[in-house]
């Protein structure tokens, strides 16, 4: 490695377990303010038989997590990425992208044909990430967040 190169940390993806709940809640509160899911909401999401959840680790740190659901819509399976959280100190290291791809791969394995998510309209870094991965804006959701900020629904086809 050259001296002026920055080593990109290795992101390890693993399934979320019930033992991770408190860490997920703490990370959710770090990442979001008024929109943060409560402990009960996170637990309920994780206990859903349709849930797919992964944790990202960098060294010993929990760097982030993703929770997604497989939903049925007009007889087709559709993935819903409910939340992607990346710890502040682990942003801009590929953690969000790694979590997004892990969720998409798992949704595809569960026969989801497409995936959608909601993102704050003012979250430019997330919007750039999703757009680069082929997500397109499909709906504007006015006053989606409790603070009155709109969300954008973005969708991506998972079928090749």
What are these regions, as identified by a protein language model?
Residues 83-85, 116-118, 153-155:
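Short aromatic/hydrophobic contact patches that present stacked aromatics
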Residues 40, 118, 131, 136-152:
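Conserved catalytic-core motifs of GNAT/GCN5-like acyltransferases
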Residues 87-101, 108-110, 114, 120-128, ...:
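Conserved glycine-rich acetyl-CoA-binding loop
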Residues 72, 90-91, 148-152:
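ABC family nucleotide-binding domain
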Residues 44-45, 123-124, 146-147:
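Short secondary-structure capping/turn micro-motifs that flank functional sites
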Residues 1-6, 143, 148-160:
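Terminal substrate-recognition subdomain of acyl/acetyltransferases
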Residues 6-11, 15-89, 100-102, 106, ...:
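Acetyl-CoA-dependent GNAT
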Residues 32, 65, 90, 129, ...:
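Conserved hydrophobic/aromatic "anchor" residues
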């Amino acid at each position: 490695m050259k001296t002026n190169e920055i080593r990109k940390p290795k992101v390890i993806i693993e399934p979320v377990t019930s033992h991770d709940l408190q860490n997920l809640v703490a990370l959710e509160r770090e990442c979001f303010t008024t929109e943060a899911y409560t402990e009960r909401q996170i637990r309920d999401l994780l206990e859903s038989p349709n849930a797919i959840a992964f944790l990202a680790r960098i060294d010993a740190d929990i760097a982030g997590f993703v929770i997604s659901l497989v939903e049925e819509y007009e007889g087709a399976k559709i993935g819903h990425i409910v939340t992607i959280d990346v710890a502040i100190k682990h942003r801009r290291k590929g953690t969000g992208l790694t979590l997004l791809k892990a969720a998409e791969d798992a949704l595809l394995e569960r026969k989801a044909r497409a995936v959608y998510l909601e993102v704050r309209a003012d979250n430019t870094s997330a919007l750039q990430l999703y757009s680069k991965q082929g997500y397109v804006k499909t709906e504007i959701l006015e006053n989606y967040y409790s603070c009155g900020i709109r969300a954008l629904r973005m969708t991506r086809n998972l079928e090749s």
